[in-house]
């Protein structure tokens, strides 16, 4: 088992109202999707150019992981997401390899996809 491909890059932003036009100019197309992920207290905008996807994440609560990330580090790259065939098997493989998982079970993220986050200290992040 292995990671299949880069699924997207997640970027924490203070305001989608400000960041969406910036990334539209940068990438050359508007976001193809905006979605509220209530469980994570974020609103996301997705951009795509070819096979490359960028997810912008704006916090909807000061308690969200994105709000805390921005408070501590400022806006910027929050995560790199990889596609996998079997998320539970991949979580087990990563755990056995010494990575610290932030959730013990997959949870729903944007696009209703199952996700699992690794602790940044496990990945030099």
Regions of interest found by a model, annotated:
Residues 2, 45-46, 82, 91-125:
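Vicinal oxygen chelate
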Residues 30-71, 111-125:
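Conserved short beta-strand elements that form part of the metal-binding/catalytic scaffold
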Residues 25-32, 99-102:
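Short Pro/Gly-enriched beta-strand edge/turn motifs at strand-loop
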Residues 1-20, 75-84:
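N-terminal beta-strand motif that seeds the catalytic metal site of vicinal oxygen chelate
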Residues 5-7, 17, 27-30, 51:
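The feature marks the first
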């Amino acid at each position: 088992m292995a990671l299949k491909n880069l699924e997207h890059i997640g970027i924490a932003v203070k305001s989608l109202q400000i960041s969406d036009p910036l990334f539209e100019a940068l990438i050359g197309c508007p976001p193809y999707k905006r979605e509220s992920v209530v469980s994570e207290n974020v609103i996301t905008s997705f951009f795509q150019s070819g096979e490359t996807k960028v997810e912008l994440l704006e916090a909807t609560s000061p308690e969200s992981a994105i709000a805390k990330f921005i408070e501590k580090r400022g806006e910027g790259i929050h995560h790199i997401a990889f596609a996998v065939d079997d998320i539970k098997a991949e979580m087990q493989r990563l755990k056995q390899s010494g990575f610290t998982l932030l959730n013990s079970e997959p949870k729903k993220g944007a696009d209703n996809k199952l996700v699992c986050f690794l602790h940044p200290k496990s990945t030099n992040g």
